A protein has these predicted regions:
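Acidic, low-complexity cytosolic segments
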Residues: 2-21, 29-188, 197-332
Length: 332
């Protein structure tokens, strides 16, 4: 059996594990395809673009994790209108699962971890030193299992608005700040609203953790991460990028996540009276101790409340619908 045939055998087990999985690809860290396998679907999937997105999903957030001194990134979830791209680093390769979350969510963590075990073993045989121990392979597959499991777990947050009453319609920033203060679950370490240039509109530090990077620098880095992912996915058949989540950490007890999502468009006038429109993004750093469900639930509530203040936005509203759909699948 050739190297490619052997790899496709293991990719096939991932494809068969869920009816929602449409395509499984393996590429190097630059996005060069190594192997792939998929099933028939009405969704147009461009493998070259997906491998480019896989490479971006890890490189885009790299600076933030380095500045936070939180390593190594394990997995990322890139939610588009049509599918979610789940990307996992295996040594010097990237595995990407193209998954229709409307069909099934979350993924089976045990099944995926088992596939990771054999894939890492084979990749090391083919491209590594061949000297990796069984305990190292088990540690890796257990980290993937824990990250997948924890992201799909947690207490559901009721869908509600945090919009304050009687705010000043001429000055929306205080009302937006009040929304950020109104979250119901202490799940974020820090979170905020940023413009496309990385300028912080408002941000909150919650946990008091002594992080090596300030909140404004963190917010700017997170905004750049989201913009890079948006640029890479421009004109994609997958639809608009609705949410990007990256998970990093040494073990399951120390997993941290970065979430970035669209948060509408802020309309304002400059000093000369010219009307301007600025895209707003929501960014957050969180611990996975509480699971991923409350994180995306609180993010949705904050973003929904901000839209009530600054006005509707189609892409952001699709994010809200996606979160509602995912959580309803989880609790069916």
């Amino acid at each position: 059996m050739s190297v490619r045939e052997s790899l496709i055998k293991h990719l096939s087990s991932i494809l068969r594990a869920s009816k929602g999985t449409l395509l499984v690809l393996l590429c190097d860290q630059n996005g060069l395809s190594v192997a792939k396998i998929g099933r028939k679907t009405e969704i147009e999937l461009d493998p070259n673009q997906i491998t480019s997105l896989a490479a971006a999903a890890f490189s885009a957030s790299e600076e933030n994790w380095e500045d936070l001194d939180i390593k190594e990134q394990i997995i990322s979830f890139s939610f588009f209108e049509m599918v979610c791209l789940i990307t996992i680093r295996i040594d010097k390769t990237l595995l990407t699962i193209v998954h229709d979350y409307n069909e099934e969510w979350p993924l089976d963590a045990d099944s995926l971890a088992s596939s990771m075990y054999y894939l890492k073993q084979k990749l090391n045989e083919f491209f590594g030193t061949g000297q990796i121990s069984e305990s190292e392979i088990e540690e890796f597959s257990n980290k993937v299992r824990s990250a997948i499991y924890l992201f799909g777990m947690g207490t559901e947050v009721p869908f509600e608005s945090y919009k304050p009453e009687g705010y000043n319609g001429e000055n929306l920033l205080p009302a937006m700040s009040e929304v950020l203060d109104s979250i119901q679950n202490p799940i974020f370490i820090r979170y905020g609203l940023v413009g496309p240039s990385g300028l912080t509109l408002d941000a909150k530090e919650v946990s008091g953790e002594n992080l090596p990077i300030g909140i404004e620098a963190f917010s700017a880095n997170a905004s750049v991460t989201f913009q890079k992912m948006k640029e890479e996915s421009k004109d994609s058949s997958l639809g608009e990028l609705l949410c990007y989540v990256a998970v990093s950490g040494e073990d399951a007890e120390n997993f941290y996540g970065l979430i970035t999502c669209p948060c509408g468009k802020l309309r304002f006038s400059d000093d000369e009276g010219e009307s301007n429109i600025q895209e707003v993004s929501f960014i957050g750093l969180f611990s996975l101790d509480y699971g991923g469900i409350p994180v995306i639930g609180e993010s949705r509530n904050i973003i929904y409340s901000i839209l009530e203040i600054i006005g509707g936005d189609n892409i952001t509203e699709r994010f809200i619908k996606t979160v509602n759909d995912i959580t309803s699948l989880k609790y069916e």
